[in-house]
């Protein structure tokens, strides 16, 4: 999907007085916060990005010189508010795009999934303003239609952007996501420490987040029970491999096992599930989910991917079964269809080979 008519305004004109450091240029990992924030929008194909600067404008402009971002200065940043900087950015983009994301520069970890779903919702409906939330708490970015932009630019500034939003009687939509980044910023040193911690772990969702993801996608209790059983068997396989000095990432295995059927009920559920999870930032988990139905080969040294595949083939419903039992019903049902039967037996033989490699069975 192309997003040529969508823009982003990143407000970076403040003094960061509560932080006691300059937030936009503080590093998290290998990039500054403002660079990571910008990258979120570039990663989905948004090219019209404006950063509104004020304090230390020269430093921000130098840092962003190679980022394909337009910078505009709020020369009165010492005497004005964040809303004034926002309006400077909105005026710059108002005539060239149909929607505008607005965000502070210290909101670096919003998921691609969140951004794309917000755009999809505004494209398919007549909402003027869409705001995301996580666990009932509103956050950023906020997506504005061109109509909302015009209304906001007429606002007198009372209570800032929230004051303008409050005036919108119809056309406001709040969307809930399983995306902690929505409500994370760096107003204080403690907030910043939490961002640093989150960055270290954000590629693999916690068990708590996995459960929330299952609930978000309305996974049935039956599928959940199966997934938990697969997760349990996956851990047993990991322990078996550890005895042979093959040390795998247990949290990656657990998350992938719990989420492997997140799209169960959809056509090509392994592809759909991996697509969702990839957009949520869980790339490694997505690869395992994609391959849990069918493996291309068995590597010399087994990985997390093979563990989840085998565990899934050892569980029927929520019960541990033999691989023969796991496939017998489908083999019988498709016994007159050589193509499908061949595919089933290929998966079965792969599972048997893996079982022999792990347990010697």
Regions found by a protein language model. Name each.
Residues 1, 35-99:
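Conserved N-terminal catalytic core of the sugar/cofactor nucleotidyltransferase
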Residues 194-269, 279, 319:
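Acidic/His-rich, divalent-metal-binding segments that scaffold phosphate/diphosphate chemistry
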Residues 242-334:
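Divalent metal-dependent catalytic cores for phosphoryl transfer on phosphate-bearing substrates
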Residues 78-151:
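Conserved beta-loop-beta/alpha segment of the NTase-like Rossmann-fold superfamily
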Residues 1-21:
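N-terminal nucleotide-binding beta1-loop-alpha1 segment
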Residues 24-38:
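Short catalytic helix/loop segments, enriched in acidic residues and glycine
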Residues 182-185, 197, 337-361:
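Charged phosphate-binding loop/patch that engages nucleotide di/tri-phosphates or the phosphate backbone
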